[in-house]
Amino acid sequence: VDIGIIRPYEVEFNQPDIEDLEQAVREFGHRVKRVYVNMASVRLSREGVSVYQAIGRGVREPVNIDGGILRHLGLIRDFEQLLHRVWVVRAIEAMGVYVVNSAMNWLVASDKLAALMMLAKSGLPVPETESSENMFMAYDAVKRFGEAVVKELRGSMGYGVFKVNDPDVAMNIFSHLLNLSKPMYVQRFLNKKGNGDYRVVVVGGQVIGAIFRRGVGWKSNVAQGARPEAVKPSGELMELALKTCDILGLGYAGVDIAETDEGYFILEVNPSMSWQGFKEATGINPARYIVKHVIDHIKR
């Protein structure tokens, strides 16, 4: 069968992950198809929906795949650009192709506010959070929290994340975000046990492994220097991760969970997780599980 690795042409944040996926597809005896969302064209007619792609002025070719793995949608510079890339993936799905993660579920899970909103509504433990375009409401949230973390809604790897305990310092950050037409996403800072958090990796409704990411500062992202350590997740950790993926409809994800004196809190969900630190610490390659999940779904 033909398995499409879906991503943009112009950028790749984690090339080793792509290489792992392509190698896994070949090891299972199937063919890799590279699908670039920003080089694709959606065609609508009486015959239905079809998708083509061409690299620049290259030859237009139909996107004919049996299954797809969505990695990410690239550096987004405009709302319409984001929507178009989402609908390119939706068009592939409309052709009857199973894509993991599906475009709409990926869109929700990759948005911090949308993801935690769904989890909070379902009764799962999330940090106290406030999101607004009103900088004075965000200012009041920092005052109320005492110590807070300010993030972008769609950031990753711990970049552009600030810890503040002075609301007036936070106001400078808020002014910058507003100048970029970005909302303010503020969370109460958690005192995490072990100065880190857990990354629980779920594929196809099963926990395949977990790591504890021990931070060197207050951040616990591997991209920020945190040390990944293989752990055996507790039953409660696994249950939280599985419920999270079920609520968000994800076929694969990394679920970040912190342990505090008040219990566990789900920090973020990563539907485009990078797994090199996880693979190094555990010896488990998520790519093989993801590819097998897609193949098994195709063969149903």
Where are these regions (language model features)?
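Extreme N-terminal starter segment of soluble prokaryotic enzymes
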Residues: 1-4
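Phosphate-binding site of ATP-dependent enzymes
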Residues: 159-244
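Glycine-rich phosphate/pyrophosphate-binding beta-alpha loops
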Residues: 270-282
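A long amphipathic alpha-helix within ATP-dependent nucleotide-binding catalytic cores
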Residues: 219-266, 288-300
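ATP-grasp fold ATP-binding core
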Residues: 119-120, 142-159, 182-193
